[in-house]
């Protein structure tokens, strides 16, 4: 739809899945990806230093994204998009520094329609992510994290 409409802006209102989907659309538009199978062409590759990054020749997105999040997923601040490969039923990550939305509107009024269970689950998910990151940064916290998370 975005390609047919000759979109010059992608706007999302919703949670992390919507945000991630739009990030993937940005890369698909820029790299002329027109089929599910062709997404393989933009999957991350391991660099000489062992880190994952965009494959050589991947074009950066040309269509910017504006995001209005309604959950606490924080995907609007990440250069990673999670997409499900239905062929293998696995969630894959696509990376490019250019897919971070150019503008994020944080409006609490928009979140009042988010179901409480969803709001709380995305918030607790961020707490888990933060504790994992903290444990990696400070190994002494690993024991504390294990004690807290079981």
Where are these regions (language model features)?
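Carboxylate- and glycine-rich phosphate/diphosphate-binding segment that chelates Mg2+/Mn2+
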Residues: 80-150
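Glycine/threonine-rich beta-strand-loop-alpha-helix active-site module
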Residues: 3-13, 17-109
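Generic N-terminal helix/loop capping motif
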Residues: 1, 5, 28, 130-137
């Amino acid at each position: 739809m975005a390609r047919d409409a000759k979109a010059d802006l992608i706007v999302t209102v919703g949670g992390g899945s919507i945000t991630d989907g739009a990030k993937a659309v940005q890369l698909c538009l820029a790299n002329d990806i027109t089929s599910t199978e062709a997404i393989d062409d933009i999957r991350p590759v391991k660099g000489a230093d062992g880190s994952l990054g965009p494959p050589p020749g991947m074009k950066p997105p040309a269509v910017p994204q504006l995001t209005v999040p309604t959950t606490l997923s924080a995907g609007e601040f990440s250069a990673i998009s999670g997409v499900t490969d239905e062929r293998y039923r696995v969630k894959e990550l696509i990376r490019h520094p250019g897919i971070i939305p150019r503008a994020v509107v944080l409006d609490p009024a928009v979140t009042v329609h988010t179901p409480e269970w969803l709001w709380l689950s995305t918030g607790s998910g961020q707490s888990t992510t933060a504790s994992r990151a903290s444990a990696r940064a400070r190994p002494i916290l690993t024991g504390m994290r294990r004690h807290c998370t079981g």
